């Protein structure tokens, strides 16, 4: 404390700018406080593990991007449901006007507690984000999507007006403003973005996200979603997809984590399968030949029987789930 006062006194004596402008004293960081990152589950255990934090970080910007039908909106809706289950408020900024309320309800979202906004233009959307962040009452803001945030000038102009770079400039200015508010808040800002083809690219990656480079810079996390497989039922009908999510940027944990999500068209991510897969991976449930045991007690013979038993015994499933989540959140063992 004495050292801090001495430093502040010396700076005040040597720098008239600080004296004339009544700037606040410098302070030392609280190492414990600044090392703790508050997170809330994404609603997918596979994705929580891939992120390395156990969920989405509060006070940060996150970008979820990918091609069409890759599961982006489903992942965002599961995050909304997870935040609600944690007792937090979520807002969905539906710039595309394509939010399917029946699908959102099937995923587990309480529609009566969901804030939904339909901004007229991009500047309106950013003004809304600022207002919500300042309240510090909204823990998750989903923006669907960056491509649909049309600048006001473009909206009010004519179709033949030149608007090159207008969208990128709006994104850059808007992100600067909201980013200045986030560090003092408990709000996660999740942007859904799309990929576009770069003209004239013959080699390398020919795809780029919309909205310029600002979102790439300000995002603490970036996740790319790719559809890796179409899922069929026993009659050959398409019932879902398998989506690969890659953490392409991560400023709060290790980057390049990968998660494969099983998404059904009528219900979203198959959470029960994720719990079992990760329980087996972390030895919460142990497999020996075709037998499955939990805490040294045999619970099922065969995987189909295992799913059946856990569906009939929700208290057993809950025990396995909680132990699995604990394993995911545990720090890695020290290197030998």
From Swiss-Prot:
What keywords are assigned to this protein?
ATP-binding, Cytoplasm, DNA damage, DNA recombination, DNA repair, DNA-binding, Nucleotide-binding, SOS response
Name used for this protein in its record: Protein RecA
Alphabetized SMART domains for the sequence: AAA (SM00382)
- Xref: NCBIfam families: tigrfam_recA
The entry's ATP-binding residues are 66-73
Please tell me whether the keyword DNA damage is annotated for this protein: yes
Q: What does this protein do?
A: Can catalyze the hydrolysis of ATP in the presence of single-stranded DNA, the ATP-dependent uptake of single-stranded DNA by duplex DNA, and the ATP-dependent hybridization of homologous single-stranded DNAs. It interacts with LexA causing its activation and leading to its autocatalytic cleavage.
Q: Output one GO MF annotation.
A: single-stranded DNA binding
**HAMAP family listed in its UniProt record:** RecA
Source organism per UniProt: Mycoplasma pneumoniae (strain ATCC 29342 / M129 / Subtype 1) (Mycoplasmoides pneumoniae)
Q: Which GO terms describe its cellular component?
A: cytosol
GO annotation terms (biological process): DNA recombination; DNA repair; SOS response
Organism domain of life: Bacteria
Q: Where in the cell is it found?
A: Cytoplasm
Q: Which family does it belong to?
A: Belongs to the RecA family.
Enumerate the SUPFAM superfamilies for this protein: P-loop containing nucleoside triphosphate hydrolases (SSF52540), RecA protein, C-terminal domain (SSF54752)
């Amino acid at each position: 404390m004495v050292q801090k006062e001495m430093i502040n006194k010396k700076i005040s004596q040597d720098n008239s700018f600080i004296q004339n402008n009544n700037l606040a004293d410098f302070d030392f960081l609280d190492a414990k406080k600044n090392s703790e990152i508050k997170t809330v589950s994404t609603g997918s255990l596979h994705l929580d593990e891939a992120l390395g934090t156990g969920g989405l970080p509060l006070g940060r910007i996150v970008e979820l991007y990918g091609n069409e039908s890759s599961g982006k909106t489903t992942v965002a809706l599961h995050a909304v449901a997870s935040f609600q289950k944690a007792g937090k408020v979520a807002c969905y900024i539906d710039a595309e006007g394509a939010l399917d309320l029946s699908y959102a309800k099937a995923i587990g979202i309480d529609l009566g507690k969901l804030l939904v906004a339909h901004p007229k233009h991009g500047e309106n959307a950013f003004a809304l984000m600022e207002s919500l962040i300042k309240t510090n009452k909204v823990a998750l803001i989903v923006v669907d999507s960056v491509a649909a945030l049309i600048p006001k000038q473009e909206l009010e102009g004519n179709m033949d007006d030149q608007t090159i770079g207008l969208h990128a400039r709006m994104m850059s200015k808007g992100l600067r403003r909201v980013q200045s508010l986030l560090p003092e808040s408990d709000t996660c800002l999740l942007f859904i973005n799309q990929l576009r083809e770069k003209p004239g690219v013959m080699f390398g990656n020919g795809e780029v996200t919309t909205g310029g480079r600002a979102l790439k810079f300000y995002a603490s996390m970036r996740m790319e979603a790719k559809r890796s497989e179409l899922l069929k039922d026993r009659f050959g009908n398409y019932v879902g997809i398998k989506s690969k999510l890659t953490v392409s940027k991560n400023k709060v944990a290790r980057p390049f984590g990968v998660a494969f999500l099983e998404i059904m068209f009528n219900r979203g991510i198959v959470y029960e399968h994720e719990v079992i897969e990760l329980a087996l991976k972390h030895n919460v449930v142990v497999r020996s030949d075709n037998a499955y045991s939990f805490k040294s007690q045999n619970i099922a013979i065969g995987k189909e029987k295992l799913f059946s038993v856990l569906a009939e015994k929700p208290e057993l499933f809950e025990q396995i789930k909680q132990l699995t989540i604990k394993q995911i959140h545990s720090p890695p063992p020290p290197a030998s």
